């Protein structure tokens, strides 16, 4: 019966919609003047829940620790989501009813004429995910991580923070004490997540990076049968799988290399978009879909190393720390620290006038993308810069992007998803660390590396690591060149009336300007591709008439010759 999704309502009148349209275990009831109804999609029987809880989901299938929940309490409806944001929870109000669901697609069925949320689209173009509490659909909202949304009556919800990431007043300075405490916390985090396992094998996504390697090592130490899965992008870029092979050999566990060839990526593109539910524009999502697909043939539980960068200030923090120090010493500089932070997403912020058609551009004029970052970067919760960046990373890139998409992709393949770094005791402990223990000179994640240096090969622990090298630009400019003419066709973009019709060709020629060069070309195209496929395959928009006047209709070499001739 696991994993499953749910959709339900709470209001002053009974709805027959669920019985007519949705198959699954069903439960209904009434409290005071309100009635409620929930269907558990994918369940043959109603899951066992705590008193007053009418719906809940655990990402890993650990049923004493739910990631989202729906409760009834004294004529109140309460929707809640844990601080890590591992499972999504959505709601909308239609007449005298509050609808809620764990998938956006389920709520699309109850909205008579759904419309794209332009603010959500703009946020997506800035971050590669839709910033909470917005979604990509008008009148549908997401419950923010660490928040409960409460209705005492139908019309006026209240929002209550149930958790804040806060810097500790006392800092751990002693390296040996920190190492000893961290080793215990890491082992305990994994032991809690394997306590319910019997003799079945589990999978671990092993990139060869530090975080996933630590998880694999701890699973082996806990006596669990482990199978590792890693991606093989072929001869493009710098391969990471040799590091995964080294770790697997060291731990004596089987390793499955998953073929992430352009052909397999293309075949999995639309299924990935549907599985994600919301638009996510990072290039890693389709390769992760392939990992889940292969793993699901051999296991029901998958472990990952997601969250390690957020907890221990991974490599992406270095330029931000430099920017923060510079800003403190030069407070009158035109571009502030939050703007610098916004630039680290490397998306379309700052390019709005060249990206959006005039009607959309006019609608977003009153928006400031920095507003979506202010709470996460609030210095009152974390006075020191490094902890403030960690708080922001947990709340933004973690809870709104990395964790919910990992769970969605696992659920689509019937997998429970477990992330040992999403452990509250471990996370709270990291806010006690002195800055020097996180970033020691130029060495990021220093204290984590010190804690595990005897658990893994030295070259794995101490090597410089970057994010997963998905060869998006190579794919887009070579293997998917003609496909871009379909996915981002000027005729379709023109009829959609969001983006300029020639945006894709502007990107590949470098004419969009600024920093959209090299790897950013592929990232920018992928962001648009994922939105367009979501718009047609999830939102259900009909495609406009295609144009044949675009460079992607020609072989790329011939188009480049044509360009030279034109100049």
Regions found by a protein language model. Give the residues of each.
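Short secondary-structure boundary/capping segments
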Residues: 272-274, 316-323, 545-546
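Adenosyl-5′-phosphate
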Residues: 1-12, 138-144, 284, 301-303, ...
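Cysteine-centered catalytic environments shared across enzyme families
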Residues: 1-17, 21, 29-270, 275-276, ...
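A mobile, often basic/glycine-rich helix-loop segment
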Residues: 312-339
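Short acidic/histidine-rich active-site segments
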Residues: 299-315, 463
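Short catalytic/ligand-binding loop motif for oxyanion handling, primarily in non-cytosolic enzymes
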Residues: 78, 87-90, 108, 237, ...
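Active-site nucleotide-sugar/metal-binding loop of Leloir-type enzymes
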Residues: 293-296
